[in-house]
């Protein structure tokens, strides 16, 4: 049994340090790692909610997008001229996703949130965890780590244990756009409010470019 919780009390949680390799995007693109990550996501989506009690959060990416847009408008972002267009694209994406099944998702599947300790993978940084569509975690994993079309098809087919339907693929592509839009807007907000010594302007540029590329595939 893996026990990483060292202590907990109301408002406090102490975890043991995990020795291991923090994965890179290139690592995630290796089939050997994808074959470990997929069952991890299955367990997360299927089992975590069964262990929880009390109030639970929901992470609906389109609400998050609207909230970030509102913050950027209120705080006079340097990108204010782009916000109406991004808001409209968010509406288009939400309509494209349509009805969803709810699972308990991680919702922040950056490569740096996976640690390989030599015997298993750990998924860390659960700040955004909450109920969401399973398509968001799958799309988030794909868009954050540059999976190929073949890898995306493998991921969807093996997650749902069925051939990939046009509807599933369309929702997945919309969620990839939404994932990149959320990351872009988060970076824009961080430009204004973060105290970290990090080039958020460049990070915004990189993510906006990736979003534009994905949008052109979603809505050519």
Map each language-model feature to its residues.
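ATP-binding pocket architecture of kinase catalytic cores
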Residues: 3-60, 64-82, 99
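A general structural signal marking secondary-structure boundaries and capping sites
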Residues: 41-52, 97, 145, 163, ...
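Short amphipathic alpha-helical segments and their helix-coil junctions
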Residues: 118, 153-171, 207, 211-218
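N-terminal alpha-helical segment
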Residues: 64-65, 86, 134, 180
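ATP/Mg2+ or Mg2+-diphosphate-binding catalytic cores
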Residues: 71-74, 78-81, 185-220
């Amino acid at each position: 049994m893996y026990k990483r919780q060292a202590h907990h009390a109301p408002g406090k949680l102490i975890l043991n340090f995990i020795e291991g390799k923090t994965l890179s995007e290139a690592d995630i693109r290796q089939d050997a790692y994808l074959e470990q990550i997929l069952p991890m996501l299955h367990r997360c989506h299927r089992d975590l909610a069964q262990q929880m009690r009390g109030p639970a959060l929901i992470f609906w990416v389109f609400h998050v997008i609207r909230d970030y847009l509102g913050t950027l408008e209120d705080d006079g972002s340097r990108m204010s001229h782009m916000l109406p267009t991004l808001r409209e694209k968010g509406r288009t994406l939400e309509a494209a996703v349509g009805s969803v099944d709810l699972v308990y998702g991680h919702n922040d599947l950056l490569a740096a949130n996976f640690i390989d300790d030599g015997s298993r993978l750990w998924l860390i940084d659960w700040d955004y965890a909450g109920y969401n569509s399973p398509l968001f975690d799958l799309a988030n994993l794909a868009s954050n780590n540059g999976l190929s079309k073949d890898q995306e098809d493998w991921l969807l087919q093996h997650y749902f244990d069925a051939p990939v339907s046009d509807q599933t693929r369309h929702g997945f592509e919309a969620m990839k756009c939404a994932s990149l839009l959320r990351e872009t807007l988060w970076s824009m907000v961080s430009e204004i409010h973060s105290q970290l010594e990090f080039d958020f302007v460049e990070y915004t540029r990189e993510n906006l470019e990736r979003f534009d590329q994905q949008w052109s595939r979603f809505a050519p």
